[in-house]
Amino acid sequence: MSKVYDWFEERLEIQAIADDITSKYVPPHVNIFYCLGGITLTCFLVQVATGFAMTFYYRPTVTEAFASVQYIMTEANFGWLIRSVHRWSASMMVLMMILHVFRVYLTGGFKKPRELTWVTGVVLGVLTASFGVTGYSLPRDQIGYWAVKIVTGVPEAIPVIGSPLVELLRGSASVGQSTLTRFYSLHTFVLPLLTAVFMLMHFPMIRKQGISGPL
């Protein structure tokens, strides 16, 4: 085993990386509220795992979506547990994200030199809200249908570009199969990819700049 470790150590300097991670200074004023960002990340990872598991059974069509969700909840092995964890974790992720934003704002964590960290965090917050909107429509039940109809109808109040923007969101003049396909693609591919990209920007900046000092 030591030979294998030595082989990787010689090429990747694993020990130096481990020392850098474990020896990072943590300011004495840090408390449990500084863990909210990490909890949000944990919820996101749970979302990815449980969401991926449900893709094996979910069918993104207007005629089969609701039935496939029922199948997950009543017949698929541990499907009820996986979907329930997905829903609970989604709510927890939104709550932790909101509390994290408040904590950063109230402690001045957005000030120089952490402006870009704040900007990427705000983008991650918008992406989190987008997860909620797109995911809400996927069961294709009454609540999801009307929620999507209302949300996608909001831009119609914008002069000139309102109607084309609504049609772009829905894929047609009304909420239908094109809307479900768009939201499913956004929820399972586009948003997770964008979230991962901005997280890869967000965390190294925190690592580089460290935790902000007390007020």
UniProtKB/Swiss-Prot annotation:
<keyword id="KW-0408">Iron</keyword>
<dbReference type="GO" id="GO:0009535">
    <property type="term" value="C:chloroplast thylakoid membrane"/>
</dbReference>
<feature type="transmembrane region" description="Helical">
    <location>
        <begin position="186"/>
        <end position="206"/>
    </location>
</feature>
<keyword id="KW-0934">Plastid</keyword>
<dbReference type="GO" id="GO:0045158">
    <property type="term" value="F:electron transporter, transferring electrons within cytochrome b6/f complex of photosystem II activity"/>
</dbReference>
<dbReference type="GO" id="GO:0046872">
    <property type="term" value="F:metal ion binding"/>
</dbReference>
<feature type="binding site" description="axial binding residue">
    <location>
        <position position="86"/>
    </location>
    <ligand>
        <name>heme b 2</name>
    </ligand>
</feature>
<dbReference type="GO" id="GO:0022904">
    <property type="term" value="P:respiratory electron transport chain"/>
</dbReference>
<dbReference type="GO" id="GO:0016020">
    <property type="term" value="C:membrane"/>
</dbReference>
<dbReference type="InterPro" id="IPR048259">
    <property type="entry name" value="Cytochrome_b_N_euk/bac"/>
</dbReference>
<feature type="transmembrane region" description="Helical">
    <location>
        <begin position="116"/>
        <end position="136"/>
    </location>
</feature>
<keyword id="KW-0472">Membrane</keyword>
<keyword id="KW-0812">Transmembrane</keyword>
<keyword id="KW-0150">Chloroplast</keyword>
<dbReference type="InterPro" id="IPR023530">
    <property type="entry name" value="Cyt_B6_PetB"/>
</dbReference>
<feature type="transmembrane region" description="Helical">
    <location>
        <begin position="32"/>
        <end position="52"/>
    </location>
</feature>
<protein>
    <recommendedName>
        <fullName>Cytochrome b6</fullName>
    </recommendedName>
</protein>
<keyword id="KW-0602">Photosynthesis</keyword>
<feature type="binding site" description="axial binding residue">
    <location>
        <position position="202"/>
    </location>
    <ligand>
        <name>heme b 1</name>
    </ligand>
</feature>
<feature type="binding site" description="axial binding residue">
    <location>
        <position position="100"/>
    </location>
    <ligand>
        <name>heme b 1</name>
    </ligand>
</feature>
<dbReference type="InterPro" id="IPR027387">
    <property type="entry name" value="Cytb/b6-like_sf"/>
</dbReference>
<dbReference type="Pfam" id="PF00033">
    <property type="entry name" value="Cytochrome_B"/>
</dbReference>
<dbReference type="GO" id="GO:0016491">
    <property type="term" value="F:oxidoreductase activity"/>
</dbReference>
<keyword id="KW-0349">Heme</keyword>
<comment type="function">
    <text>Component of the cytochrome b6-f complex, which mediates electron transfer between photosystem II (PSII) and photosystem I (PSI), cyclic electron flow around PSI, and state transitions.</text>
</comment>
<dbReference type="InterPro" id="IPR016174">
    <property type="entry name" value="Di-haem_cyt_TM"/>
</dbReference>
<feature type="binding site" description="axial binding residue">
    <location>
        <position position="187"/>
    </location>
    <ligand>
        <name>heme b 2</name>
    </ligand>
</feature>
<feature type="binding site" description="covalent">
    <location>
        <position position="35"/>
    </location>
    <ligand>
        <name>heme c</name>
    </ligand>
</feature>
<dbReference type="InterPro" id="IPR005797">
    <property type="entry name" value="Cyt_b/b6_N"/>
</dbReference>
<dbReference type="GO" id="GO:0015979">
    <property type="term" value="P:photosynthesis"/>
</dbReference>
<comment type="subunit">
    <text>The 4 large subunits of the cytochrome b6-f complex are cytochrome b6, subunit IV (17 kDa polypeptide, PetD), cytochrome f and the Rieske protein, while the 4 small subunits are PetG, PetL, PetM and PetN. The complex functions as a dimer.</text>
</comment>
<keyword id="KW-0479">Metal-binding</keyword>
<keyword id="KW-0249">Electron transport</keyword>
<keyword id="KW-1133">Transmembrane helix</keyword>
<keyword id="KW-0793">Thylakoid</keyword>
<keyword id="KW-0813">Transport</keyword>
<comment type="similarity">
    <text>Belongs to the cytochrome b family. PetB subfamily.</text>
</comment>
<feature type="transmembrane region" description="Helical">
    <location>
        <begin position="90"/>
        <end position="110"/>
    </location>
</feature>
